[in-house]
Swiss-Prot record:
It catalyses: Endohydrolysis of the N-glycosidic bond at one specific adenosine on the 28S rRNA. Residues 112-137 have a biased composition (Low complexity). Belongs to the ribosome-inactivating protein family. Type 1 RIP subfamily. Residues 112-175 are annotated as: Disordered. This is Albumin b-32. Its EC number is 3.2.2.22. It comes from Zea mays (Maize). PROSITE patterns: SHIGA_RICIN. A possible regulatory factor for the synthesis of zeins, the major group of storage proteins. InterPro entries: Ribosome-inact_prot_sf, Ribosome_inactivat_1/2, Ribosome_inactivat_prot, Ribosome_inactivat_prot_CS, Ribosome_inactivat_prot_sub1, Ribosome_inactivat_prot_sub2. It is an enzyme of class 3 (hydrolase).
């Protein structure tokens, strides 16, 4: 029986619509004069150009989410011998695809829906921006593997099948997406310290953009042989970025509101939230959808 064609992934959809990244930020990981902190600050600055100010919220607010995102950016992590490119949605800072040193795009296939990335409290961070249930999460080679950023086939390049050289296939389980990224990073450079830096960057870039506290932690431990370890509180905050963003909108309307969920995260008010979180996820789309649903329910009751 012929296999049903899957729904277009975000990467394929943006290419079909001729949507190109708004910018590409290159990070030469071996350049001691361009530290991780400078890289994250530069990417944030470019993202903020597409953000909006919201009355009562201190942080820039990301663009509203769309089913097929139209705002993207790439970050290219380079060594002297190779590079890895990450495709990141600007409306929610989710990592949904990456290009290996061999030029193969791997993407998070639908129907998986990316949510906030997960970090084990007190442990090292896991795959950034791509947390979904093990039943739905699938990494697969993109059919657009050998195309450039404008969707054109690169001369002389063939699209690849199979894995990234890390021993894992396309149908990865909940943890294998991060393993594929790590394998790609390891292939980029044989030097152990550079491999470590690449893996940490691949894991941390999305959360590093979202969180002031996390990016400072990563920067402080960037050259550590032991990797970067988050506190229990930091891990919980990373898991609740969506909820912290929602709280920022609540505080905008009710500045003195006591929000129990935030107190559990060690965030007592909007000032504390602004110290911890650098960029807020837009809640206006969700609010509009909720209002529409409520209106429909009222209409049904009146009918």
């Amino acid at each position: 029986m012929a296999e049903t064609n899957p729904e277009l992934s975000d990467l394929m959809a943006q290419t079909n619509k001729k949507i190109v990244p708004k910018f590409t930020e290159i990070f030469p990981v071996e350049d001691v004069n361009y530290p991780y902190s400078a890289f994250i600050a530069s990417v944030r600055k470019d993202v903020i150009k597409h953000c909006t100010d919201h009355k009562g919220i201190f942080q820039p607010v990301l663009p509203p989410e769309k089913k097929v995102p139209e705002l993207w950016f790439y970050t290219e992590l380079k060594t002297r011998t190779s590079s890895i490119t990450l495709a990141i949605r600007m409306d929610n800072l989710y990592l949904v695809g990456f290009r290996t040193p061999g030029g193969v795009w791997w993407e998070l296939a639908r129907p998986a829906t990316p949510t906030s990335s997960a970090t084990t409290p007190g442990g090292s961070a896991s795959a950034a921006g791509t947390r979904t249930s093990s039943a739905t999460r699938v990494w697969r080679p993109s059919p657009w593997a050998a195309r450039d950023d404008q969707g054109r086939q690169r001369p002389g390049e063939e699209e690849e099948d199979g894995d990234t050289g890390g021993g894992g296939g396309a149908d990865a389980d909940a943890d294998a997406g991060g393993a594929e990224l790590a394998a790609a990073a390891a292939a980029a450079d044989p030097q152990a310290d550079t491999k470590s830096k690449l893996v940490k960057l691949v894991v941390m870039v999305c959360e590093g953009l979202r969180f002031n506290t996390l990016s400072r932690t990563v920067d402080a431990g960037f050259n550590s042989q032991h990797g970067v370890t988050l506190t229990v509180t930091q891990g919980k905050q990373v898991q609740k970025w969506d909820r912290i963003s929602k709280a920022a909108f609540e505080w905008a309307d009710h500045p003195t509101a006591v929000i129990p969920d935030m107190q559990k995260l060690g965030i007592k008010d909007k000032n504390e939230a602004a110290r911890i979180v650098a960029l807020v996820k837009n809640q206006t789309t969700a609010a509009a959808a909720a209002a529409t649903a409520a209106s429909a329910d009222n209409d049904d009751d009146e009918a």
